[in-house]
Amino acid sequence: MAKGFTQQSSVDFVDTYSPVAKFASNRIIMSVVATMDLELHQLDVETTFLNGELKEDIFMLQPKGFEIKGLEDEVYKLKSSLYGLKQSFRQWYLKFHWAILEIGFEMNPLDHCVYIWRCYDELKILSLYVDDILLAGNSLDMMIKTKSFLASRFEMKEMGPATCVRI
């Protein structure tokens, strides 16, 4: 874990953002799921913060217990974001955002963590809550394709159909 509390704004990072779908958005999605009898599945992104790409140069001491003998005082330049950095959430979100747009989803202009995909009579709605994803749709085949795409980009844990959603 990085020591984000030692970071200085405009020196070590510029932007921060936590990708959390709005409470009202998730309630609307649940209403649409119930009204249209959509499938609702849950996914969890593993090692979320390692997916973000850093724009800044960040250096880190070796974590205690993982020091290399003879090189205990060395510092290392991070290649990707890490849990604890102030910009990690934003960097993860940007990586996810561009990936999901690539397969035709459109970002909801009122909630940047809700994405919609429509094609003729097929519909998919995706809600992002940091590293947790709710995916609703009326075509199981299209949902499977979306999950396969996400799994090809990110290490995913398939949680299956959502049985209990706390909103």
Positions of the model-derived regions?
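Long, low-complexity, charge-biased intrinsically disordered regions
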Residues: 1-167
